[in-house]
């Protein structure tokens, strides 16, 4: 069968680098002013969903930094689902987070804990558990170790909500269903941080210049993505056939590019807070071969075959049958 991935991987609309003029249309003010940068911006139309298992100390630090960044900078909703033997988040992260954020900023956070002795972290299923709780028009599938420039968040949401003028046809708006808020290529900044450095980052009102030990690295399809929530659910959310780690990011991009032809990418950087990796977050996990076979199968599908698969695959049918509150 013909492989359709190559042409779809390149069929993305590239957004020019963000300028104050572009973002000021969203926040209605000039974001170059320091007092504006310290403001909390409105992202009520977006819910961030973050799957979590804290296996290392640096992972604990990363989720704390990420949540402080999101909750201080944006009026938004964040759902964190933690699956583990016991809740390290409740024991160690939540008290520090409450100390760092005022009560009104914590209102947007929902923490769900599911007790499990299972070693395997079924990331795709956990993401879907949260996705089907989302009631906002935009959803961001968000890794716990990721930071974006502050301006990237409202611009990505605005693209989905309000479209992009003249992106494909002169004088017409184009509405992406998925936005990758970072460039493809060496747009990843790998951050090797310390407690002292992230504390300085937070206290400096999130000045990324604080991080002096980083290197540029490849960025493709992981980290985080903004979705039109309705479309995300209609096309199956995350494929629960992918277990633990491996190939789910590739398949997700291929699926939405192939079926919707409405995937946008921003020419911006993504910051990744580095961390130690267990088998659940690397290619030596026991499910990697099954994941690879599923990816090989799906990337050989044509558009109508992919649509048929996601209309009929068991987990997605069960999810869509859940009544909406």
Language model regions located:
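C-terminal catalytic/acceptor-binding lobe
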Residues: 2-32, 41-43, 58-62, 219, ...
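Conserved glycosyltransferase catalytic-site signature
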Residues: 123-128, 145-146, 153, 220-224, ...
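Conserved catalytic core of nucleotide-sugar-dependent glycosyltransferases
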Residues: 131, 149-240
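A conserved acidic beta->alpha catalytic loop
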Residues: 55-56, 81-97, 146
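Active-site-proximal specificity loops/subdomain of glycosyltransferases
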Residues: 88-133
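A conserved hydrophobic helix/loop-capping motif in glycosyltransferases and polysaccharide synthases
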Residues: 46-62, 73, 81
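Short, acidic, metal-binding catalytic loop of nucleotide-sugar glycosyltransferases
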Residues: 65-77
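Short beta-strand-to-loop acidic/aromatic patch adjacent to the donor-nucleotide binding site
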Residues: 136-149
